[in-house]
Amino acid sequence: MMWWAVWCAAMVAGSVFTAAAPPTDSIDLMQMDPSLADDESLGFAMQSLSGRYAAAPWLYLLADVSHDPQNGSDRVKRRMPSLSIDMPMSVLRQKLSLENERKLQSLRAMANRNFLNDIGKRGFHWAPSAKAAKFY
């Protein structure tokens, strides 16, 4: 609890030596004037503050400064052409995979066809075909 009291005392002592307002020349914004209250968010505060702080040279109104985060800076972003080969390689891999699957399926179908042709025939087709044995 003692540290809290020491901290409060340090804050009070430090606030005595701080400046009450920034110097007039350090901020280059428009001074507060009742005729400039165009911002809807500051309109309710202007009437009560204008008579009280109008003579204070350090109080400024930020109504003319844009509050829109979409506005951004005036810097134009250069759009460089994208030279990524990720998507074309992905497409080629997919097509290669489909082609390999198609070939494998046709070879399996041919092996099945040869196997079914060899069933029940005891003549010169007695040995299973070489192609069918290769793919199982």
Swiss-Prot record:
Residues 1-26 form the signal peptide. InterPro entries: Corticotropin-releasing_fac_CS, CRF. Residues 27-76, 123-136 form a propeptide. The modification Isoleucine amide is found at I119. GO terms for molecular function: diuretic hormone activity. It holds the Pfam family CRF. Disulfide bonds: none annotated. It is found in: Secreted. GO terms for cellular component: extracellular region. It comes from the Eukaryota. The keyword Secreted applies. Keywords: Amidation, Cleavage on pair of basic residues, Hormone, Secreted, Signal. GO terms for biological process: body fluid secretion. Regulation of fluid secretion. Belongs to the sauvagine/corticotropin-releasing factor/urotensin I family. This is Diuretic hormone 41.
